[in-house]
């Protein structure tokens, strides 16, 4: 494998990681429907240790606008309820005798537009990350060419492949963002 191939493989892996990161970030964006990803960032004080909610309770979505949290220990119910409330997710958890219900209120049109702006902003941030990776890879190719590790023709081919890879990555970011926008704006 040549130096150019190594650099292109690193770029490909970096772009894939950036796309995965964007998907993960957008999964936790509220859409007006119940999604377990909404509670991903919630941590509970479990015997003095900050523990992710999904490690102390069973989470489920029985209805489109309801998340149910069934703790494995009943004494955690008030702690879980407080943690969800303190997470500033725009939801109001309600505790029962053995579980916590988290009803998801419908989003207003104004709030939907705000969320779409946030989604677009995250998409732009990830496009910039992809372009920065291309810039770094381009610099590596140019240095390798200058040092004589890569022939000029191979460097040109590698730069063309890098541009294609970058364009595909940016296009995928646009597709992911468009799908999330559609999901958020759906009533």
Curated annotation (Swiss-Prot):
PANTHER family listed in its UniProt record: MITOCHONDRIAL RIBOSOME RECYCLING FACTOR PSEUDO 1 (PTHR20982:SF3), RIBOSOME RECYCLING FACTOR (PTHR20982)
Gene Ontology CC terms, in alphabetical order: cytosol
Any GO MF annotation of the entry: ribosomal large subunit binding
Family annotation (Gene3D superfamilies): 3.30.1360.40, Ribosome-recycling factor (1.10.132.20)
Annotated family: Belongs to the RRF family.
Listed NCBIfam families: frr
Compartments where located: Cytoplasm
Name assigned to this protein: Ribosome-recycling factor
